[in-house]
C-alpha cells in the first residue's frame, strides 16, 4: 500500500463520531454501484447489531440494483429538521454534494455532525466535522470492514454480505492492481462472518440474453485510436437495445485487450451530455478526467462532457497520457 496516498481523518475518528450519536443517517452517491450501496447498508447493519438502541436511516434510491440484497430505505420525507439537528450524517464513497443522492437534505445544513467515509483522493464540499478518507483502500466497503474489525464490532452475516458486495465489485473481483493483502485479509473476515458469498457470485456472474446482445454490439462497434479502445453508447444505441444510461455503465467489457492500455465508455445521458468511464491497466487516467472536470482513482475515473466533440479530444488526451 502506497504511504503517499491521500488521507484525512482516521478510523478512530469515525468510530468516535458513530458512538457519540444515537441517530445516524447514511447517504450513497448517484448512479449507485455495489460499493456505495454495500458500504451504506453494511455500515447500517453493523450499527444496528452493535448498538441496538441507535436509530439508523439509509436514504437514497438503488435504481433497481441488487434487489436480492434486501436493502431497506427510509423515505427522505421522514428525515425532519428536528431529526437532523440530533443526527450524524454519514456519506460513504462520495465527496461532492452534486454526486450524492438526496443531497437536498445535506443542503439544509441542519445535521449535528457530518462524517465522510471515502476512498477517493479528492477534497469535498460536505462541511464535514469528521473524516475517514484514505485512498489506499480499494473500496469504501473495505474501510467499513476495517473499522468494524479494529473497533471489535460484531460482523453479522447480513452486514458481511453487503460489505463483501462492495469490495468484490469495486476491486473488479479482486483483479485490480490496488487489491492488497489488507483487502484479502478483510475479505477473509467476511467469509468468517458467514457472508453469503455464493449468492453474490451467482447473482453477479450469470449472463442473460440481453447481456450477450449488449456485448455483441459493443464488440462489433468499438473504436480504437492507437493504444486506446472505446465505445460510444449514444441514444440510438440505447433505444435499439432498450437499455438505460445507467445500464450502459459497463466499461470493463473492453478491459485488458492486448495493446490497448486505456479503455473508455462514453454514455449519452442527454443532449450534449456524455458521461465518460475511464479505465486502464496502470496508466494514470485520473489526470485526464480532472482536465474535463471529473476525478476518481489512477486506474478508474469518470467525467461528464458537455459536447460530443469532446469525445475525440478525450481519446487523444488518453493516448498522450500513455506516452507520458
Curated annotation (Swiss-Prot):
It comes from the Bacteria. Divalent metal cations; Co(2+), Mn(2+) or Mg(2+). GO terms for molecular function: 3'(2'),5'-bisphosphate nucleotidase activity; exonuclease activity; nucleic acid binding. Keywords: Exonuclease, Hydrolase, Nuclease. Gene3D superfamilies: 3.10.310.30, inorganic pyrophosphatase (n-terminal core). In accordance with its dual activities, is able to complement both orn and cysQ mutants in E.coli. PANTHER family: BIFUNCTIONAL OLIGORIBONUCLEASE AND PAP PHOSPHATASE NRNA (PTHR47618:SF1). This is Bifunctional oligoribonuclease and PAP phosphatase NrnA. It comes from Mycoplasma pneumoniae (strain ATCC 29342 / M129 / Subtype 1).
Amino acid at each position: 500500500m502506497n504511504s503517499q496516498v491521500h488521507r484525512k481523518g482516521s478510523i478512530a475518528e469515525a468510530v468516535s463520531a458513530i458512538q457519540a450519536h444515537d441517530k445516524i443517517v447514511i447517504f450513497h452517491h448517484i448512479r449507485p454501484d455495489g460499493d456505495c450501496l454495500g458500504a451504506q447498508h453494511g455500515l447500517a447493519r453493523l450499527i444496528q447489531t452493535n448498538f441496538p438502541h441507535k436509530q439508523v436511516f439509509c436514504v437514497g434510491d438503488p435504481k433497481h440494483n441488487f434487489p436480492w440484497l434486501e436493502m431497506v430505505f427510509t423515505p427522505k420525507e421522514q428525515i425532519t429538521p428536528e431529526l437532523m439537528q440530533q443526527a450524524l450524517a454519514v456519506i460513504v464513497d462520495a465527496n461532492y454534494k452534486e454526486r450524492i443522492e438526496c443531497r437536498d437534505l445535506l443542503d439544509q445544513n441542519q445535521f449535528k455532525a457530518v462524517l465522510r467515509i471515502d476512498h477517493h483522493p479528492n477534497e469535498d464540499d460536505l462541511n464535514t466535522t469528521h473524516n475517514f478518507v484514505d485512498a489506499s483502500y480499494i473500496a469504501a466497503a473495505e474501510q467499513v470492514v476495517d473499522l468494524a474489525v479494529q473497533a471489535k464490532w460484531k460482523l453479522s452475516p447480513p452486514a458481511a454480505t453487503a460489505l463483501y458486495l462492495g469490495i468484490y465489485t469495486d476491486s473488479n473481483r479482486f483483479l485490480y492492481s490496488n487489491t492488497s493483502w489488507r483487502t484479502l485479509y478483510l475479505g477473509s473476515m467476511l467469509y468468517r462472518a458467514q457472508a453469503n458469498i455464493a449468492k453474490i457470485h451467482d447473482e453477479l456472474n450469470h449472463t442473460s440474453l440481453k447481456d450477450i446482445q449488449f456485448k455483441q454490439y459493443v464488440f462489433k462497434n468499438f473504436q480504437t485510436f492507437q493504444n486506446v479502445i472505446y465505445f460510444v453508447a449514444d441514444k440510438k444505441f440505447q433505444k435499439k437495445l432498450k437499455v438505460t444510461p445507467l445500464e450502459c455503465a459497463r466499461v470493463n467489457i473492453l478491459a485488458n485487450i492486448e495493446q490497448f492500455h486505456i479503455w473508455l465508455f462514453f454514455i449519452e445521458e442527454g443532449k450534449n451530455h456524455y458521461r465518460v468511464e475511464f479505465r486502464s491497466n496502470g496508466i494514470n487516467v485520473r489526470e485526464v478526467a480532472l482536465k474535463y472536470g471529473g476525478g476518481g482513482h489512477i486506474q478508474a475515473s469518470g467525467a461528464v462532457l458537455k459536447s460530443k466533440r469532446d469525445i475525440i479530444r478525450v481519446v487523444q488526451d488518453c493516448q498522450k497520457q500513455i506516452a507520458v
